[in-house]
Amino acid sequence: MGPSFLTRRRASSILHDVVRERVVVIIPARYASQRLPGKPLLEIGGRPMIWHVYERARRVPRVERVLVATDDERIVDVVRRAGGEAMLTSSHHRSGTERVAEAAMHVEAEIIANVQGDEPFIEPAVIAAALEPVLADPNILMATTSEPMESAQEVLNPNVVKVVTDREGFALYFSRQPIPWPREAVRQWGSLEAALRAEPSLLRLYRRHTGLYVYRRELLQQWAAWPPDAS
């Protein structure tokens, strides 16, 4: 998994007392998935997908609490019967981040990690990598992670979100389209797919966004209050 990259920093440096900030992982999980209804409860190795995510999040150092935020009593029941913590949230959220923001209103934590409920194989080290820059610098308001892509099919897949960063690891662009665009290689080979097959080294240009986010509470609350883009 690639290094974490930062997406938001305070405009000005603010001195903070050195304190141990509370870290909570919130796992948004929606039952009525359009592509695969009931996905969080699908069994993998005899256990529900959501419980695999929960247990992996619980193994991350510095995480004091793990909470599933869902819109369905069935998911709440499964998590609680397994010994975990779950909260019922609104069924009208437009995104997992909105669900996380609602759940965060009921927890005491300065740093909140949003770990997707359909990532049963996520490594605890990846979550820790996303937490690291936020824990290290009080001026960092948000962080996320990316990983290298391994095939032309992945680069061309619109269901895979790509990211371009600067040299310091700050995100510049996110897109479902292939970014960056190797213009000269495409011109030479006729298409991006042909270029990627002819020059496998081009794959090193592409990184997949993992969908994992870490927020400071203040930014998450601001985000939840912003109106949606009308475009």
Residue ranges and their predicted role:
Residues 19-69:
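N-terminal glycine-rich phosphate-binding loop and ensuing alpha1 helix
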Residues 67, 73-132:
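Short phosphate-binding loop-to-helix
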